[in-house]
A protein has these predicted regions:
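N-terminal nucleophile
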Residues: 1-207, 216-218, 239
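Canonical tetratricopeptide repeat
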Residues: 244, 278-279
Length: 304
């Protein structure tokens, strides 16, 4: 039915789960993660309590192995369940019930577990592990590579439908809205993995752009512009990033360069021009900067 990976990143301490299934809206069912605690994947005739209870057990001090044993020993239908857990120490444990539909199995690695059931081939979970361990990238991209490797081996016997990815911080801050670093989901799609890959790329772009906010607040406009330009290079199709970069460049004194980007955004959607003036009303842009931008935009229009 499903293939997934749970993992802890040694360098950052982040925990993650990524999954793909021929099942509508897999995201609320399979991936569970809590900052500073660990991650759980529960699948194959899903017992949703494995997710929340598994995290509670980890939070109470259980190891991954102890938590998994507690879950399965109290489940009269453990033979149809598949579950994997990674704890705060990076220890992993997995269970593939004897009545999971074949091909079904799992493999454990250093800080991760790959598991699958109802696969076309029994090579899926090993291929996932190999892709995860040989990809040099952040945790999310390594998990993405694992999912793509599973699909390359034939994936779910029934086909493809939904996918999801969750990454949380290695240390909890008590602020869940900050601790949940990545939370992406493709609920129903003909090609869920390419769409998940696209969403991850856009998420990275906006995370990079987000770093520019702090730099701008501290007066480092050059640093902010560099971050925004990097974000734009990751997702050049995102009009908002083009507009944001252009405005920041104009504020920093490069009105000509900034106006080029703003003009490109306006050509895509003319309402971005109105946005310039609305930003002035809430003190996010100075009126003189907008006047200078408008002068450049008028000059560009005359040349066109």
């Amino acid at each position: 039915m499903t293939y997934s990976i749970v993992a802890r990143d040694k360098k950052t301490g982040e925990f993650g789960v990524a999954v793909q299934s021929h099942y509508f809206q897999v995201s609320p069912a399979v991936p569970w993660a809590l900052a500073g605690v660990g991650a759980v994947a529960t699948q194959s005739h899903v017992n949703l309590s494995y997710g929340s209870l598994g995290l509670e057990l980890l939070q109470a001090g259980y190891t991954a192995e102890q938590a998994l044993k507690a879950l399965t020993s109290g489940d009269p239908r453990a033979e149809v369940r598949q579950c994997a857990i990674v704890d705060a120490a990076g220890k992993v444990a997995a269970h593939t019930g004897s009545k999971c539909i074949p091909a079904a199995g799992h493999t454990l690695g250093d800080g991760f577990s790959c598991q699958a059931n109802l696969m076309e081939k029994d090579t899926v979970w090993e291929a996932m592990a190999d892709a995860f361990t040989t990809t040099d990238a952040p945790l999310a991209e390594r998990m993405m590579a694992a999912l793509e490797a599973a699909e390359a081996e034939g994936g779910d016997l029934r086909g493809k439908q939904s996918a999801a990815m969750v990454v949380v911080a290695g240390v909890g801050t008590g602020r869940p809205w900050n601790d949940r670093i990545i939370d992406l989901r493709v609920e129903d799609a003909a090609e869920p993995l390419p769409e998940l890959r696209r969403l991850l790329r856009i998420k990275r772009a906006y995370m990079t752009a987000g770093d520019a906010d702090h730099l701008e607040e501290t007066g480092d406009l050059a640093g902010a512009i560099a971050q925004l330009q990097q974000a734009l290079s990751i997702a050049p199709e995102m009009i908002e990033l083009r507009f944001m970069t252009g405005c920041t460049m104009a504020v920093a004194g490069d009105v000509d360069g900034g106006s080029v980007l703003i003009a490109e955004a306006i050509r895509k959607n003319g309402r971005w021009r109105d946005m310039l003036h609305r930003l002035v009303t809430v003190d996010l842009l100075r009126a003189d900067v907008v006047s200078a931008i408008e002068a450049r935009l008028a000059a560009v229009s005359q040349r066109i």
